[in-house]
Amino acid sequence: MILFILLVGTLLLMIGIPTIARSQERIIKIDGSSTVYPITEAVAEEFQKMKKGAVKVTVGISGTGGGFKKFSRGETDISDASRPIVKKEIDACKEIGIEYIELPVAYDGLAVMVNPKNNWVTSMTVAELKKIWEPAAERKITKWNQVNPAWPDVPLKLYGPGVDSGTFDYFTEAIVGKSRSSRGDFTASEDDNVLVQGIASDRGGLGFFGYAYYAENPDKLKLVAIDGGKGPILPSEKTVMDGTYNPLSRPIFIYVNKKSSERPEVKEFIEFYLKNAPTLVKQVKYIPLPEKAYKLASERFSKRVTGTVFGGEAKIGMKIEDLLKLEEKK
C-alpha cells in the first residue's frame, strides 16, 4: 500500500512538471505583415539565440490588416505593419482600451515585376498601372495590348497580395487613387513566395510586392521601372532613400501593445530589435532607416509614447526626411 502511494505520488509529480514548465515559459506573440515578416523573424531568431530558450517568439503572417485585427483583440503583443495604422483599426484598439507604441523599423519600395521572358516591357507609367488595376478593368483588360497598343496580344495574368495586406492597401492608394480600390480577378496571396512562383511561371504575368522579395529572387523575375512623372526609375536602396522611386516608397513598422511592453521579455525584445535593426534589416535585403530615426524610435519606446503620427492615413511617397520630421514632432 505504501509502495502504491509512493508510485501514485511520483506519477503526479511527473505529470505536474511539464505544467509548471509551461506556466513559466515566456512567449512573445507577433503577427501581421508578410513584408515586415523577414525582418521581425530575423530579429526573433537572434533574440532567441541570445536568450538560450528562456523566451519563445512566435511570428505569424496574416497581412497588415489581419494582424491589426488580432492586435486590437489583444491576441498579440506586437503587430507587423507595412503601412500606418488606419482609423478603423485605431477605433478598434480604443474599444477595448489597447494603447500602442508606433515604431518605424525600415524603408521599403514596392516592386512591380514581370516574367523574365517578357521582352516588351522595361518600364511602365503610373497611368498604365492604374489602367490595369482599377476596378473598371476587371474582366475587361485581359491582354497586354489593351494596356498599350505597342505591346503584344498576350494574356495578362495578375498576381498580388490579398486584401488584408498593407501592401495591397498602399499600392491601390498610390496607383489607383483609393485604398483597397482594385479589380478582383487576380491571384492573391499573403505569402509573397506564392506570388514569386506565379509570375515566374507565367510569360504574361505581372505582380507587385515588397522589393526585398524581388532581391531574393532576381533570377526568377524581371523588375519594371516605374515612371511617376519624372521618367522611369527602378527601385534600389538609393532611389528609395532619396525619394526618387515615387510613389511606391514607404516606411514599414511594428506596433507594440503598451501593456505588453511592461513585461520584461517584451521590453528587452523591442530594445534588441531597435538596436540590431540597422544590421539585420540589410541582411534581409531591406533598407535601414538613418541612425537618427532609430534613436528617435528608441526614445519613443523608452518613454512609452503612444498613438500614431500619421493621423490614421497612409502617407503616399513619403521621403525619409519627411518621416524624421514627423518623428521629431511626436
Which role fits each region the language model picked out?
Residues 4-16:
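Bacterial N-terminal signal peptides
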Residues 16-22:
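A short, compositionally biased domain-edge/stem linker segment
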Residues 22-330:
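Flexible loop/hinge segments at secondary-structure junctions
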